[in-house]
From Swiss-Prot:
One of its GO terms (biological process) is regulation of chromosome segregation. This is Putative melanoma-associated antigen 5P. Signal peptide: none annotated. Residues 3-124 form the MAGE domain. InterPro entries: MAGE_N. May negatively regulates apoptosis. It comes from Homo sapiens (Human).
């Protein structure tokens, strides 16, 4: 086999690697979408409230090691989040009758992330 034939023989494999990487990214994106759908379907939301209803067996309000309540931090975060929501609502055109499902999901996800960060800050 000549050098030229070897180099041509290697080129299709490079194309396969690129295709596999592209398919891998698509697979990751599909898995992420499926996970987001699973989270949104498993998180019970109560219309008209800012947060979620805790699932049965979930821990109650977070406490610091000294026993003090985490309410001041939660209030600060809630006020900050409301100010952000207020500014984004001013940008919307016209009233909407029902909340966008994506925005509901994002709000629930933001709350969970904030709770996790708060918990980790208290723990470590």
């Amino acid at each position: 086999m000549s050098l030229e034939q070897k180099s041509q023989h290697c080129k299709p494999e490079e194309g396969l690697d690129t295709q596999e990487e592209a398919l891998g990214l698509v697979g990751v994106q599909a898995a992420t979408t499926e996970e987001q759908e699973a989270v949104s379907s498993s998180s019970p939301l109560v219309p008209g409230t800012l947060g979620e209803v805790p699932a049965a067996g979930s821990p109650g309000p977070l406490k610091s090691p000294q026993g003090a309540s985490a309410i001041p931090t939660a209030i600060d975060f809630t006020l900050w989040r409301q100010s952000i929501k207020g500014s984004s609502n001013q940008e919307e055109e016209g009233p909407s009758t029902s909340p966008d499902p994506e925005s509901v999901f994002r709000a629930a996800l933001s709350k969970k992330v904030a709770d996790l960060i708060h918990f980790l800050l208290l723990k470590y």
